[in-house]
């Protein structure tokens, strides 16, 4: 998994303990399979090189903020809470925080949308996964609340999430390709926004 997908899965599992149990079970099976594999011979030189590489790995001692309302994987990744984020304006009622950029247009970012905001109509060239961290939104007759993921498949047309009017909504988003905004102004702004 990419860094973006791994964080999405870990954050989603925080909201669903039954998924955490399945992952622990699958990791146990993986461990059993590795234990039963035939060992591969390795030269002393390569073994020493591997140990040196391990010794040279950076040590990260990130401790999430005690006051963080975020799931632990995301709090550790952000090294804090949502209150510390410097949001960047995307458009009326919409803000983003870019977190990670991979190859071929893969991006991990946070979206903050004011209550009652309509996301501009757009099409998807690649997969998009949106995990609700706070608040809620709906797309047609589907409603997404905290801990739920919406998966927008490549080729999805006329996608327009609408933020519920109760409170602002914050989401963790993975996009695998740029979106196509329908509005002319949106397309003009898209290079500046970076989506």
What are these regions (language model features)?
Residues 3-7, 11-17, 21-83:
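Positively biased amphipathic helices and basic secretion/translocation or surface-docking motifs
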Residues 68-102, 106-108:
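Charged, low-complexity intrinsically disordered boundary/linker segments
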Residues 94-97, 101-124, 152-157:
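Conserved short histidine dyad/triad with adjacent acidic residue
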Residues 114-117, 124-139:
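Glycine- and acidic-residue-biased ligand/ion/polar-headgroup-sensing regions
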Residues 123-125, 142-144, 163-165:
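Short glycine/proline-enriched turns and hinge-like loops at secondary-structure junctions
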Residues 139-160:
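Short acidic-glycine-tyrosine-enriched beta hairpin
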Residues 156-181:
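Ligand-binding loop in jelly-roll beta-barrel domains
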Residues 177-195:
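Amphipathic alpha-helical interface segments
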């Amino acid at each position: 998994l990419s860094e973006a997908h791994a964080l999405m899965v870990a954050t989603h599992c925080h909201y669903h303990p039954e998924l955490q149990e399945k992952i622990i079970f699958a990791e146990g099976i993986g461990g059993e399979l590795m234990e039963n594999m035939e060992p591969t011979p390795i030269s002393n030189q390569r073994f020493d090189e591997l140990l040196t590489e391990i010794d040279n790995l950076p040590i990260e001692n990130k401790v999430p903020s005690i006051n963080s309302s975020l799931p632990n994987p995301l709090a550790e990744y952000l090294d804090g809470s949502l209150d510390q984020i410097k949001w960047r304006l995307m458009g009326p009622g919409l803000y983003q925080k870019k977190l990670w950029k991979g190859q071929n247009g893969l991006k991990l970012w946070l979206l903050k949308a004011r209550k009652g905001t309509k996301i501009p109509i757009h099409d998807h060239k690649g997969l998009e996964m949106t995990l609700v961290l706070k608040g809620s939104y709906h797309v047609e007759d589907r409603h997404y609340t905290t801990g739920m993921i919406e998966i927008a498949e490549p080729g999805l047309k006329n996608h327009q999430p609408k933020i519920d009017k109760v409170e602002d909504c914050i989401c963790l988003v993975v996009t695998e390709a740029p979106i196509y905004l329908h509005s002319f102004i949106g397309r003009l702004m898209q290079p500046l926004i970076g989506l």
